[in-house]
């Protein structure tokens, strides 16, 4: 309902504006309280890069984190990640993810990052404590990536990237709850990189384009890998911030599901729920983020799409140059 108000043409947002003004006041107060030293900002012995959003979910932030981890690991840097762990709930934080971790406690995105990359991942609502736990476990990290957390100002950051979806952009431009904005659009003036997810003819000067590119589909039970190709008899599901993006991507690659089903972001699935969605020889196709939560009860007709990020070579050099110079600065001082 709210997403239709935020990204559609409905005037219902007008009724929510008073609440947005309250949110905006406290959001601004929170930021300036750290900016002017009224509240403590915690700095660590390694550089920290935050990859976040100005809006609520579904912008492609986590794929961007995965891309950056791969780029840095390829260059020999030791990388750690901290995350809030949305969708998870635990009695004890921070959590250092390992082979026994489950998404119900640590969240789906941190578990996905760990499984894809193998880097140390620390989860906590308090990112300062998450970083401390990470460095206690591995003091020799070269850099730490914060998956989201742009508004977590208690954590000092050396570099900030903001990911913007090319289609949804900033919706109606209003603060929560009348709109999707966590902060004003002017916040873009203070970040080191604006990453536009998807093709766009109208981008900010200096912004960098990224594209989500499906590489293969992978079976949840057997691990079999197949190339992306036109498929029939497919039921597609997505429990992410912007499910329609996943379905549109499938169509771009010749996959036209007989049925598409949207779930809320971080939705927790059950075997009974998903097994009832297909019949006969139909394939159940989902995002990798969904698959992370289904591995323990998956059926052999369940597959997920492996997606990579594609960024132009010159833009890649530009992004990594700033990061590597920051890492070297910390090592020399």
From Swiss-Prot:
The keyword ATP-binding applies. The keyword Membrane does not apply. It catalyses: a lipid A disaccharide + ATP = a lipid IVA + ADP + H(+). It holds the Pfam family LpxK. One of its GO terms (molecular function) is tetraacyldisaccharide 4'-kinase activity. One of its GO terms (cellular component) is plasma membrane. Transmembrane segments: none annotated. SUPFAM superfamilies: P-loop containing nucleoside triphosphate hydrolases. Keywords: ATP-binding, Kinase, Lipid A biosynthesis, Lipid biosynthesis, Lipid metabolism, Nucleotide-binding, Transferase. GO terms for biological process: lipid A biosynthetic process; lipopolysaccharide core region biosynthetic process. Its EC number is 2.7.1.130. Pathway: Glycolipid biosynthesis; lipid IV(A) biosynthesis; lipid IV(A) from (3R)-3-hydroxytetradecanoyl-[acyl-carrier-protein] and UDP-N-acetyl-alpha-D-glucosamine: step 6/6. ATP binds at residues 55-62. It is an enzyme of class 2 (transferase). Belongs to the LpxK family. PANTHER family: TETRAACYLDISACCHARIDE 4'-KINASE, TETRAACYLDISACCHARIDE 4'-KINASE, MITOCHONDRIAL-RELATED. Transfers the gamma-phosphate of ATP to the 4'-position of a tetraacyldisaccharide 1-phosphate intermediate (termed DS-1-P) to form tetraacyldisaccharide 1,4'-bis-phosphate (lipid IVA). NCBIfam families: lpxK. This is Tetraacyldisaccharide 4'-kinase. It comes from Blochmanniella floridana.
């Amino acid at each position: 309902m709210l997403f239709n108000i935020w990204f559609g043409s409905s005037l219902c947002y007008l009724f929510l504006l008073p609440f947005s003004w309250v949110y905006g006041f406290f959001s601004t107060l929170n930021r300036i309280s750290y900016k002017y030293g009224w509240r403590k900002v915690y700095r660590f012995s390694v550089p920290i890069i935050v990859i976040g959003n100005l809006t609520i979910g579904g912008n492609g932030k986590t794929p961007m984190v995965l891309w950056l981890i791969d780029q840095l690991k390829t260059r020999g840097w030791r990388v750690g990640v901290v995350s809030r762990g949305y969708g998870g709930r635990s009695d004890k934080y921070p959590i250092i993810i390992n082979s026994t971790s489950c998404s119900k406690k640590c969240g789906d995105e941190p578990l996905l990052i760990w499984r894809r990359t193998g880097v140390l991942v620390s989860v906590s609502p308090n990112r300062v404590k998450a970083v401390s736990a990470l460095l206690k476990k591995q003091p020799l990290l070269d850099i730490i990536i914060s998956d989201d957390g742009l508004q977590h100002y208690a954590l000092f950051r050396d570099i900030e990237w903001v990911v913007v979806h090319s289609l949804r952009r900033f919706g109606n431009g209003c603060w929560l709850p009348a709109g999707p904005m966590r902060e004003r659009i002017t916040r873009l003036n203070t970040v080191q990189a604006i990453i536009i997810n998807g093709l766009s003819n109208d981008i900010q000067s200096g912004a960098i384009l990224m594209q989500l590119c499906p590489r293969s589909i992978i079976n949840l039970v057997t691990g079999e890998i197949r190339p992306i190709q036109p498929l029939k008899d497919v039921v597609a599901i997505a429990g992410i911030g912007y499910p329609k993006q996943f379905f549109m991507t499938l169509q771009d690659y010749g996959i036209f599901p007989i049925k598409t089903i949207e779930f809320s972001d971080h939705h927790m699935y059950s075997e009974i729920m998903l097994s009832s969605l297909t019949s006969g020889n139909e394939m159940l196709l989902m995002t990798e983020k969904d698959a992370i939560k289904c591995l323990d009860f998956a059926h052999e007709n369940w597959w997920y799409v492996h997606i990579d990020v594609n960024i132009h070579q010159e833009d890649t050099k530009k992004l990594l140059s700033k990061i590597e110079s920051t890492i070297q600065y910390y090592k020399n001082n």
